[in-house]
Amino acid sequence: MTQLAIGEATPHGATYDGHGVNFTLFSAHAERVELCVFDSRGNERRYDLPGRRGDVWHGYLAGARPGLRYGYRVHGPWQPAQGHRFNPVKLLLDPYARRVEGELKDHPLLHGGHDEPDYRDNAAVAPKSVVISDHYDWEDDAAPRTPWGKTVIYEAHVKGLTYLHPELPQEIRGTYKALGHPVMVAYFKQLGITALELLPVAQFASEPRLQRMGLTNYWGYNPMAMFALHPAWASSPEMALDEFRDAVKALHRAGIEVILDIVLNHSAELDLDGPTFSLRGIDNRSYYWIRDDGDYHNWTGCGNTLNLSHPGVVEYACECLRYWVETCHVDGFRFDLASVMGRTPTFRQDAPLFAAIKACPVLSTVKLIAEPWDIGEGGYQVGNFPPPFAEWNDHFRDAARRFWLPRNLTTGEFACRFAASSDVFKRNGRAPGASVNLLTAHDGFTLRDCVCFNQKHNEANGEENRDGTNSNYSDNHGKEGLGGPLDLMERRRDSIHALLATLLLSQGTPMLLAGDEHGHSQHGNNNAYCQDNALTWLDWQQANRGLTTFTAALIRLRQQIPALTGNSWWEEGDGNVRWLNKNAQPLSADEWQNGPKLMQILLSDRFLIAINATLEVTDIVLPEGEWRAVPPFAGEDNPVITAVWQGPAHGLCVFQRG
């Protein structure tokens, strides 16, 4: 290898051209940048990056090839009060690294210093960036581009979804490969979901606190390298990218989209006592929101917050998203704590990152889903994200639980949430699909636990049950825990059926948590982020097959109802919806606000949802005509009902006009 040539300022990261590697690094405040390369024995050689265009440092290393391990040492001021924490003794990861060798361990050498710099070299223990080649044969792969009106999302964890699946080869369980295996593809198709939304797959780290407790970060919301796949779910680290792309290709062939949960709000460097392994040492002042005293704004609850209004960081975020779309063919993103994306530092719909995404021909055409809050002041922004974003709708989640489980909720509030929360999302030209309706998600109780536990049981997390929300809107139906007498178990089953029907037959985009269709329980743990064990892994051998069949039938039914698949707002008299009382008459103003939880929802003038959310059996008079209950509420040969449905307590039934 020779000394570095000046190279080019783009593309960002380490790019192999067949003859050598071009390296670039953004740092607005650095005074000097050293590229450090390592041989197979760990010997280090350093080169100054000779070029600088604007805030991008660059150089070209002739003869370098894929597999080369490298990092950076960045020189600049140590001025903590001004937000500058340069420390060239610390080897740093390339923020654009496509592969990383080594884990982020709880090691004293990885700390850059608090008030004074830590002068101990960390190269022996620091993770290393690795040069890769992105070549891959996509064959005839094409994005499914499922319309929002027909989209049904399935949220899953790469490992937890398949680790215990008995029909998969042992060696691929819990891996990217398993996602595209014919057994899983067939299951997704039988269930009827159209999009697989994966918890974070970008390489992440376990927080030092968890490592000291013998736990790991299971969910993955602690990002370490945003362009690199988490290697633990591949047959070998160097195969992660191809195995993930193989899975995407197989899912696309089956018409299933792949959506990634992505964490663009903070990094695994955490607070000032956390490790310094990348952004803090590269350009702390640019990458993070810094307070006047030099500490971090902690709007994420994770110690730091990425400054996504800084031009260099906006470019970093957009290039990251484009990488996943262009290199891995993913179909969209769910953004964790997405209010951070709009902070300037107050939330703005025209924030720089939103504007950049909207202007990008690649990103503006994929599915974009916001978790529309963070923990900072003004962080709750449900309904306020600009097009083309959809948003998780916590109003729907809470209303569905409060309606069917013993909580106070009016019929009017329930109907509003059933109709895609038009009071929240019908603005800025957005369609009903902007409301991503959910009952449960990775964060919180599973659906089964919603009907079995009144209180969270998070003792296994090591925080004395202090972590996790206390606002669960759950109901154990009379006994805390999974067991109980037959009549109690039947009431729980009825509640689960009613909740699933509400989710899958309401307007908006439904999201189903993987395992809810099995009856999966986390035994009351509503914050299982650190439980990489049987508590979170889906037990396919214990799955409730009847509940899976029920869920699949609901999804098939949904796809038959034009009022749900059309993705247009319901208007008075358009034939999409009529709201009726138990006597098949329009609901009165008093019934909307004060009436019993009894109603009928007529969709597309052909499908009738009869609802009895009271504690008593109640006769419900159906509208004129011949009505037949449809699967999953009856068999195909179910007799016609012409007048009255005897609605059981906490009961729901769907009829089709003859």
Swiss-Prot record:
Region (Disordered): 459-484
One BP annotation, GO: glycogen catabolic process
Active site residues per record: D336, E371
Name of a matching Pfam family: CBM_48
Site entry (Transition state stabilizer), positions: D443
SMART domains: Aamy
Transmembrane segments: none
Record's catalysed reaction(s): Hydrolysis of (1->6)-alpha-D-glucosidic linkages to branches with degrees of polymerization of three or four glucose residues in limit dextrin
UniProt cross-references to InterPro entries, sorted A to Z: GlgX_C (IPR040784), GlgX_Isoamylase_N_E_set (IPR044505), Glyco_hydro_13_cat_dom (IPR006047), Glyco_hydro_13_N (IPR004193), Glyco_hydro_b (IPR013780), Glycogen_debranch_bac (IPR022844), Glycogen_debranch_GlgX (IPR011837), Glycoside_hydrolase_SF (IPR017853)
Keywords: Carbohydrate metabolism, Glycogen metabolism, Glycosidase, Hydrolase
EC annotation from Swiss-Prot or TrEMBL: 3.2.1.196
Pathway where it operates: Glycan degradation; glycogen degradation
Any GO molecular function: hydrolase activity, hydrolyzing O-glycosyl compounds
Alphabetized CDD domains for the sequence: AmyAc_Glg_debranch, E_set_GDE_Isoamylase_N
Keyword DNA-binding: no
Family label: Belongs to the glycosyl hydrolase 13 family.
Function: Removes maltotriose and maltotetraose chains that are attached by 1,6-alpha-linkage to the limit dextrin main chain, generating a debranched limit dextrin.
Protein name as it appears in the record: Glycogen debranching enzyme
Protein species of origin: Salmonella enteritidis PT4 (strain P125109)
